From Swiss-Prot:
Pfam families: GDT1
GO CC, any one term: membrane
Signal peptide, first to last residue: 1-26
Organism whose genome encodes this protein: Oryza sativa subsp. japonica (Rice)
Residue stretches spanning the membrane: 67-87, 106-126, 138-158, 189-209, 227-247, 259-279
Gene Ontology MF annotations: calcium ion transmembrane transporter activity; manganese ion transmembrane transporter activity
Compartments it resides in: Membrane
Protein name: GDT1-like protein 4
Amino acid sequence: MARRVSTTRLLLLLLLVAAAAAAAAAGDQEDPRGGGDNGTARLDRRTKMFLHAARASDGGATGMEKAGLGLFDAFFASLSMILVSEIGDETFIIAALMAMRHPKSTVLSGALSALVVMTILSTGLGRIVPNLISRKHTNSAATVLYAFFGLRLLYIAWRSDSKASQKKEIEEVEEKLEAGQGKSTFRRIFSRFCTPIFLESFVLTFLAEWGDRSQIATIALATHKNAVGVAVGATLGHTICTSFAVVGGSMLASKISQGTVATIGGLLFLGFSLSSYFYPPL
């Protein structure tokens, strides 16, 4: 009897052990599946984060490409505008005539300093205007200005006598230079800081450029194009034109047909007007 009881207890104990082992085995099999689900979820989250980062980087790259295109577009527009509007202009002739009587390096440095200051002021004014007036209105104003200057230049090219007008303009500039010879008070005040020749070149160039069509066109360009591109392009254009004027002197100015320059400039300004009208900034 005692042996039967002990045998029964032993069987019950074995059954309990077997049940516990089976439960443990089942738990071990469920854990990997749960871990796999968690791992898959973590992998999905990482994949989404990677895709989001990749899209963001692609968007940033696209934005940089657009900014680069805007910079080069403004640069070439400003450069071409200055080249066709400044060759043979009053500032061009001033630099050419002064270089015939004074050291070329001094005349060039004074004229370029004035033109750089004028370009920075014009570009800054062009960036301030859109903050005061809506971008749509500034673009419309720029379109009208481009068309006005283009038609005006074409009218000048059609009506003017190239040789007579060029000779008259040179005589007017010579009169201004001769009139400025007697005014030495301004020179004496600043003689400690700048040489009289540098100062004369700077002041004459600055006053001749103020209100000129190239300054107004620079302001108009800066209202709807990249300001850095406009400033760099205009500065490079002024540097090229003024360098030609200083090196070539009046000989180069007298051989360039003002009618041809006015025609090219008029067509270019009309092209700017059409581009601004049909492709306005966003």
